[in-house]
């Protein structure tokens, strides 16, 4: 018989920038097998206007064998619903803590790969209006219409590389079409499964200019 026990757990997150001076807060959710400590470095050159917050998935593991490099993930197929719930609670708690201490002109969330699915689930239950999904499949357990907003100040973007090894050409086109039909601005760049700096800055410029 399977049993569960609810108890407290310490989660880890990394930040970059000065929240007292920044105009915008950018939550960045890493992909499968990445660590927040290194993922956040992809956003270091955005400038002083951004305070970057990189939460880390609750599961950490050795990427190969039983030693060496470590990565993290947001969930696996095992006890999936429990992990989703725990992650939602932890992200909500983190946002509440930051909101109680700082104020920003704009809040933005970016989810990369597996972190994109996590971001999609998270943004259905909170009020972050500016969303960037990057090289991810939309999670099948939530209604896509739940992220559609009629508010004028909402910005939603999706980006993917032409050489992304996790999407063949047909899958790229269908994924781009899926997000476009939801009202997302879509972006495609000439690279693999990665964050493209030029595309990122173009998206952020579009979000922050309004």
Q: What annotation goes with each model-predicted range?
A:
Residues 31-35, 114, 136-140:
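Short beta->alpha connector loops
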Residues 41-44, 124-125, 177, 181:
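Short, well-ordered alpha-helices that flank and scaffold nucleotide-derived cofactor binding pockets
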Residues 7-19, 23-102:
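Serine-hydrolase catalytic machinery in alpha/beta-hydrolase-like enzymes
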Residues 118-122, 142:
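Hydrolases whose catalytic domains are alpha/beta-hydrolase-1, hotdog thioesterase
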Residues 108, 130-132:
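Residue in the alpha/beta-hydrolase core beta-strand immediately N-terminal to the catalytic nucleophile
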Residues 110-115, 119:
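Gly/Ala-rich beta-loop-alpha elbow adjacent to hydrolase catalytic centers
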Residues 137-209:
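The feature captures the conserved acid-bearing segment of alpha/beta-hydrolase catalytic domains
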Residues 55-58, 132-140:
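Active-site nucleophile loop of the alpha/beta-hydrolase fold
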């Amino acid at each position: 018989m399977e049993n569960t026990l609810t108890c407290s757990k310490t989660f880890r997150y990394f930040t970059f920038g000065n929240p007292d001076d920044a105009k915008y807060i950018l939550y960045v959710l890493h992909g499968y097998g990445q660590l927040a400590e290194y993922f956040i470095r992809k956003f270091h050159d955005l400038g002083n206007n951004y305070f970057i917050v990189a939460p880390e998935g609750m599961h950490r593991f050795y990427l190969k064998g039983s030693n060496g490099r470590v990565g993290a993930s947001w969930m696996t197929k095992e006890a999936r619903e429990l992990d989703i719930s725990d992650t939602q609670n932890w992200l909500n708690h983190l946002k509440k803590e930051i909101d109680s201490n700082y104020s920003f002109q704009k809040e933005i969330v970016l989810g990369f790969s597996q972190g994109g699915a996590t971001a999609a689930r998270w943004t259905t239950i909170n009020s972050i209006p500016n969303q960037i999904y990057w090289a991810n499949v939309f999670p099948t357990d939530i209604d896509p219409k739940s992220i559609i907003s009629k508010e004028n100040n909402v910005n939603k973007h999706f980006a993917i590389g032409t050489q992304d090894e996790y999407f063949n050409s047909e899958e790229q086109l269908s994924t781009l079409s899926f997000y476009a039909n939801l009202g997302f601005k879509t972006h495609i760049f000439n690279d693999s499964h990665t964050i493209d700096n030029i595309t990122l800055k173009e998206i952020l410029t579009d979000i922050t200019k309004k």
